[in-house]
């Protein structure tokens, strides 16, 4: 279910404040966050966020294509080990 347009996108206040401060001081630093639920705003483009995936922080560099998505979409929480390999059965000679 989509979020109501009148409510606007959800972004944690501390993220907006940190990015605004960085824009004012013309700084580029990695912003460490646990807020996977925050929506990426146009002001975030060009900045790097370290998004927690439950175990470690994954660096996410924000581009224009990411605007409107959530930060958590770019920090996968599960590792895929691959499917088990199918064992080859040796064929009997002459068959």
UniProtKB/Swiss-Prot annotation:
GO biological process: ribosomal small subunit assembly; translation
Any Gene Ontology CC annotation: cytoplasm
Keywords on record: Ribonucleoprotein, Ribosomal protein, RNA-binding, rRNA-binding
Xref: Gene3D superfamilies: 30s Ribosomal Protein S19, Chain A
Gene Ontology molecular function terms on file: rRNA binding; structural constituent of ribosome
InterPro entries in the record: Ribosomal_uS19 (IPR002222), Ribosomal_uS19_bac-type (IPR005732), Ribosomal_uS19_CS (IPR020934), Ribosomal_uS19_SF (IPR023575)
Entry's family note: Belongs to the universal ribosomal protein uS19 family.
UniProt-listed HAMAP family: Ribosomal_uS19 (MF_00531)
Chain's role: Protein S19 forms a complex with S13 that binds strongly to the 16S ribosomal RNA.
Protein name as catalogued: Small ribosomal subunit protein uS19
């Amino acid at each position: 279910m989509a979020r109501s347009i009148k409510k606007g996108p959800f972004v944690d206040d501390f993220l907006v404040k940190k990015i605004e401060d960085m824009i004012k001081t013309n700084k580029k630093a990695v912003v460490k966050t646990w807020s996977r639920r925050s929506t990426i705003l146009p002001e975030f483009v060009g900045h790097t966020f370290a998004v927690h995936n439950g175990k470690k922080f994954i660096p996410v560099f924000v581009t224009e294509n990411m605007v409107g998505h959530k930060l958590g979409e770019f920090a996968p929480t599960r590792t895929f080990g691959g499917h088990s390999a199918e064992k080859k059965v040796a064929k009997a000679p002459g068959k």
